[in-house]
């Protein structure tokens, strides 16, 4: 975009800002804006295979930034799309590694996921236990969340209680139902109509189990359906709060100051659709530009 603008408007002054909403590129956006470094961690990929992933360190090593997509992203599964089998286990490994490094705050970006496990894999990686009706422990995936009978949070790594965890979430969908995780995002992850219904029933059962485990129903909290219901998992299993990812990034890079005298703001969206009206980068940028919400 920069080259095109300078070609057609030779006298224009341009400034490029790395902007992401919690999905791919978010770690680089923070590091580019604030300085920092990447830390490589060996974790599990969406199919429980070993891979090298990473998290970013900013604010003099006090804050870690994690992209869910870096180890549970859709590009990692290539032609093996199947949200019944993929896991967020690696995300939990990244969160635990960052916490053990001594950071005070962890920012987790949701988006671009290949999963629909409600964050169960990530939870299992940090010590949360899931049991089926026979009392057998297992690590749920999208296709087996329907088998969850009980959740035990007592074994969760204690160090996580000493770290502030913030989740960047760019959509406001609930856990399940017509506008939930499975129905809205399942098809892009490889789910056909029958599979969507199966996944949705699984997330509904997970919601029941979460309610029993933490004593409250979070299924309608905006954003709990994000990234295959990972939003719900971040609240229930990690004690995190959800906030608009784009708001977090733009505030961090002091975007308002940068555009105070701008005539135009050019941003992008992989596909302009109904989700663009629910907090995507292209709309949130304009909201901030004009000082009011655009719908």
Task: Give the location of each predicted region.
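Carboxylate- and glycine-rich phosphate/diphosphate-binding segment that chelates Mg2+/Mn2+
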Residues: 68-69, 136, 165-227
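Solvent-exposed alpha-helices and their adjacent loops that cap or buttress functional pockets
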Residues: 33, 47, 55-60, 98-100, ...
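Anion-binding (especially nucleotide phosphate/pyrophosphate-binding) glycine-rich loop
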Residues: 50-115
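Conserved small/polar residues in nucleotide/adenosyl-binding loops
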Residues: 287-294
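Glycine-rich nucleotide/cofactor/substrate-binding loop typically near the N-terminus or early
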Residues: 3-78, 166-175, 181-182
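Charged helix-capping and loop-helix junction motifs
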Residues: 278-284
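Glycine/threonine-rich beta-strand-loop-alpha-helix active-site module
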Residues: 85-89, 93-96, 100-107, 115-164
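Oxyanion-binding "anion nests"
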Residues: 198-262
